[in-house]
Amino acid sequence: MTISVAVSGASGYAGGEVLRLLAGHPDVTIGAITAHSNAGSRLGELQPHLHGLASRILEDTTVENLSGHDVVFLALPHGASADIAAQLPEGTVVIDAGADHRLEDPAAWEKFYGSAHAGTWPYGLPELPGQREKLKGANRIAVPGCYPTSALLALTPGFAGSLLQPDDVVIVAASGTSGAGKAAKVNLIGSEVMGSMSPYGVGGGHRHTPEIEQGLGNAAGEAVTVSFTPTLAPMSRGILTTATAKVKPGVTAAELRSAWEEAYDDEPFVHLLPEGQWPSTKSVQGSNHAVMQVAFDAHTGRVIVTCAIDNLTKGTAGGAVQSMNIALGLAETAGLNLQGVAP
């Protein structure tokens, strides 16, 4: 079975990463490649690393150009996907890498994004409890945010196992600059970023906060309160998340580790490292893998989980392709058998 796929937003980092993965997918033929502001340009001018697709000409992002494909990936700015998605045929599998369809609560969407809620689609993080079944046969899929991907992978086993308290969760995550997109910004130029780290969205203002609370709350079966602080790190790609939560009385270090082992032992892309080994962003660069370590701080009664992912791969495009594979009944790992890059 050969699947025809269209990719919108192909001039950006997320769209380019989707194309990189699809170019190596055994079951996919790449059809329309669109980028509204760069229509008419050669893809190779904007994504010079995509050698096999370099001669392709970018088309305008219209419903007409995207229709007629089995799958459409939307790698568009937040708020831009909903209108296009609503006009695509119901039988088309539409995978939205933007935020438009992630949140279940319309009030949370309106508070953090400032527009009308477009509805909720199945959430494309297969490793969450019960999520694979929801993705099978789905024709609309919301790709998680990059920070929520790492945060939810880090803490979901503890909340799903009723081991953690819901009211004191603290998450600090460092991301590479590609997470801020490709548009030129003064704070992202080399002389500002090199040798420096800086927080942003501090004090509960980051848009991924409600998404993290939603996912952890679904796992816990009750509301979870999260303090989330993102940090910009001097690297092009990668996320290193440190997530902590108070454990419930009587929970032991052995119980914690057992919960994470049980959650991820059979997962092809999520790996709990041997005790004493800690995650690094370099070890997952360019891959769809997530690596993590869990520890118990007996002094404070907190679990500490560190998780490393590539924000563009597992955090965006890899998760999108993985979800597509599940939705279409393909091998879940198809097109994703990539190891990290070293040194």
Curated annotation (Swiss-Prot):
Show the disulfide pairing: none
The protein's predominant localisation is: cytoplasm
Location of this chain's protein in the cell = Cytoplasm
Identify the catalytic residues: C146
Q: In which pathway does it act?
A: Amino-acid biosynthesis; L-arginine biosynthesis; N(2)-acetyl-L-ornithine from L-glutamate: step 3/4
Entry's PROSITE patterns? Answer: ARGC
UniProt-listed Enzyme Commission number(s): 1.2.1.38
Q: Which superkingdom heads the taxonomic lineage of this protein's source? A: Bacteria
> What Gene3D superfamilies does the entry give?
Dihydrodipicolinate Reductase, domain 2, NAD(P)-binding Rossmann-like Domain
HAMAP family linked to this entry: ArgC_type1
Q: NCBIfam families annotated for this entry?
A: argC
Full protein name? N-acetyl-gamma-glutamyl-phosphate reductase
Say which species the protein is native to: Arthrobacter sp. (strain FB24)
Protein encoded by which gene: argC
